[in-house]
Amino acid sequence: MTNVNAVRFESVDVVFGQRAGEAIALMDQGEGRDSILEKTGSLVAVHDASLFVNEGEILVLMGLSGSGKSSLLRCVNGLNKVSRGRVMVKAGEKEVDVASCAEDVLREVRRNRISMVFQQFALMPWLTVRDNVGFGLDIRGTPKAERDRLVQEKIDLVRLGQFAEKFPHELSGGMQQRVGLARSFATEAEILLMDEPFSALDPLIREHLQDELIELQRNLKKTIIFVSHDLDEALKIGTRIAIMEAGRVVQFAVPEEIILNPVNDYVRQFVASMNPLTVLKGGTLMRPADDLVREPGSSFIQLDRAGRCRCQLDSAGRPNNLMVNGRPGQFVQYSTELDLAAAADDAVMITGSDRTPMRAAVTVRQLTKRPLVLLGDDGALLGVVGEHELYRGMLRQTEAAKVNVSGPNKAVV
């Protein structure tokens, strides 16, 4: 991931109807969505949306039905006309405003920069899996040898090699959506637009495909804008999340910020039943290294509040000379295969990173009775997550999720 914007929305308005100009004037006067619809017959689908997604990130647009998330997504490839504002898409070394560029420029961006995955798969029923995956390449006019190579590569990537000559009706829903993913990957577009791609699937299949998408993203590093109405899904896959209500972006933040600091009651209703264990990360929970107790007259610092686990730091801030209950100890990196119960019997402390999930910290604390030690990519001590930090994290999430309204906000359908 980089800090370079792949797509940037700048004060985007989308109005459907014949009297968009009048509707925009009323928007500027502070009129609400329902009032504008009544007065002009025009629907404000998106109102003053400003957000971005960096290269290699996943931005999730989420909200209730009618909140404007799909309407905003479809501005990126020009399927929806932007009434006001700019949608900047990185195309090579330059940026293109797809809201105002010439038609030939927009076609070029669609053909080479952007691909789309739909909720209902959008496969051609008369084409085999192989030909569905190659459809975008055929439209582009890709030479046959290159086309065949790319198609086979992407079919294998989504593990559908043995089904390449099957037709869509011969596949399960989950397999059909894998074909849709392979078709998007085959064009080698850098930006993928995914409009509730898994919502039509059974829960277990949906969760499995979410995991597959995360794994594929680790290798492909695409820029993805993903529409969802499911906060669990958004928190699981999103680098950043934009929560929308009645056409407006009400909060745009990383998942942990959404959970810990919801901006209003609408967002609090989404997070009220969230399990923080898979969302909150070590970096959010930890007691920083600078706050750890330094022992007077010694170079040791205490890694736990009881002082049973102690270490020194080298000149680069890396921990060494670990002592656990008076015995020389060792640091062992956390993994799901690690025998933590055995580690509790040895002079071992488990290490993770600022990205280690809260669930792992809970497991380490429960089975070893010691804090999780967080290290940076350079091995320097970042901090620790012990019992106190875990309780504090749970309390912060509980307080953040408290709702002060008597009932749910009215959805706009």
What are these regions (language model features)?
Residues 36-40, 95-115, 261-262:
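ABC ATPase NBD coupling module
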Residues 77:
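Helix-to-loop junction immediately C-terminal to a conserved catalytic motif
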Residues 167-171, 175:
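Conserved ABC ATPase signature
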Residues 26-35, 90-98, 134, 138, ...:
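Conserved ABC ATPase "signature" region
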Residues 290-326, 346-378, 384-413:
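The conserved cystathionine-beta-synthase
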Residues 249-253, 261, 384:
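ABC ATPase "signature
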Residues 188:
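Conserved catalytic motifs of ABC-family nucleotide-binding domains
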